[in-house]
Amino acid sequence: MAPDGAPVDETGTLVHESGGFLLKRDRGGTFTLDLRRTPVDLVEKRVRITGWETRPGHVDVEGIQKYRY
């Protein structure tokens, strides 16, 4: 069963800020990310995330990986 909210499949730059993580989206804007693990090896790198937008601007991340153009 899928979580409540809209599915998300986005690319951008992973940023560590204020004790949490943000995705600076390639399409503009940001998402605040709820992550199950701390992806220190991906900070300040381009990534692709998948998950669910649980409330406006907040994503429960199911997957995160390094992304190339």
Q: At which residue positions do the language-model features occur?
A:
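OB-fold and OB-like single-stranded nucleic-acid-recognition modules
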Residues: M1-Y69
